[in-house]
From Swiss-Prot:
Native species: Encephalitozoon cuniculi (strain GB-M1)
Single GO term (MF): ATP binding
Location within or outside the cell: Nucleus
Reactions that this protein is recorded to catalyse: L-seryl-[protein] + ATP = O-phospho-L-seryl-[protein] + ADP + H(+); L-threonyl-[protein] + ATP = O-phospho-L-threonyl-[protein] + ADP + H(+)
Name recorded for this polypeptide: Probable casein kinase I homolog ECU03_0910
InterPro entries per record: CK1_Ser-Thr_kinase (IPR050235), Kinase-like_dom_sf (IPR011009), Prot_kinase_dom (IPR000719), Ser/Thr_kinase_AS (IPR008271)
């Protein structure tokens, strides 16, 4: 039986999405400020699933989870998840920086995104909705976290490590803009797909947009089809044109992984750290939004 959340007061709505709303809340006993995620009835059960994923992940690279249960909202009890309040998402920070990050910032973020995805994969889950909105810094702005596990799924048995069988009849799960090509083509998602989405995020941050943004369609399915066709027609070489060769190498490597292959996360991080070093830059944690002087110059770094 689901317990009632009694000591949390909802203070201010800060986000709203297809699955529910997120509030700033306050613990009326300790005065601690928290985040509270509420579930819309149409998606009943998704928040409980997300709570289970957070518990399975253990909390060292995810926000702390304080409580799950029923909470009174607008005179109705709904499912609620009380968790550590986070800072801004990468999408919010991207907007702050006029929708363009410097190469240094993107490479440092890439290293940290790979770290978070590797942590998730080692605990037998794939995220299936990797995008800038789902990477957030803590309130201090020191550490990057991957959040929103409502679509996360075990890709292998946690006891035997037997991989889930590949299916080729799946509908699109996640956000079409950042979904891997194979996700559009109906393949069951695995580790390679999360990492392809990381690659798309880096291209987005460096170029300001992806080629399949803004496509017009009459229906959602038609739009998905047009995005798929765009991803099929644009080679990775074309996608990464004008960017450091390491970004292309990253995207090419993950695109060519097999369904059950374990990615070489260390190799991917090395690609990004090498790109920094060749430019005479250090992964020092100083990002564009901290200094507010982002530079888009590629300098002498070899590009495609």
């Amino acid at each position: 039986m689901t317990t009632e959340i009694r000591n949390i007061k909802l203070v201010q709505k800060i986000a709203s999405g297809a699955f529910g709303d997120i509030f700033i809340g306050q613990n009326t006993v300790t005065n601690q400020t928290v985040a509270v995620k509420l579930e819309k009835k149409a998606h009943y059960g998704q928040l409980k699933h997300e709570y289970g994923v957070y518990k399975a992940l253990g909390g060292t690279r995810t926000p702390r989870i304080y409580e799950y249960g029923k909470i009174l909202y607008e005179n109705v009890y709904v499912n609620g998840l009380v968790m550590e309040l986070m800072g801004k998402s990468l999408e919010q920070l991207f907007v702050t920086c006029s929708r363009r990050f410097s190469l240094k910032t993107v490479l440092m973020l890439g290293e940290r995104m790979v770290d978070n995805v590797e942590y998730l994969h080692h605990r037998n889950y794939v995220h299936r909705d990797i995008k800038p909105d789902n990477f957030v810094f803590d309130v201090q702005g020191d550490r990057l976290y991957l959040i929103d596990y409502g679509l996360a799924k075990e890709f292998r048995n946690p006891m035997t490590f037997k991989h889930r069988e590949m299916r080729t009849d799946k509908s699109l799960t996640g956000t079409a803009r950042y979904a891997s090509l194979r996700t559009h083509q109906g393949y069951e998602q695995s580790r390679r797909d999360d990492l392809e989405s990381v690659g798309f995020c880096m291209v987005y941050f460096l170029k300001g947009r992806l080629p399949w943004q803004g496509l017009k369609a009459k229906t959602k399915q038609e739009k998905y089809d047009r995005i798929r066709e765009s991803k099929e027609s644009i080679s990775l070489y074309e996608l990464c044109m004008g960017l450091p060769k390491e970004i292309h190498s990253f995207c090419f490597y993950v695109r060519n992984l097999g369904y059950e292959d374990m990615p070489n996360y260390a190799y991917l991080r090395t690609l990004l750290s090498d790109a920094l070093r060749q430019r005479g830059l250090r992964s020092d944690g100083v990002f564009d939004w901290m200094v507010r002087t982002p530079s888009d110059s590629m300098g002498d770094l070899e590009i495609l």
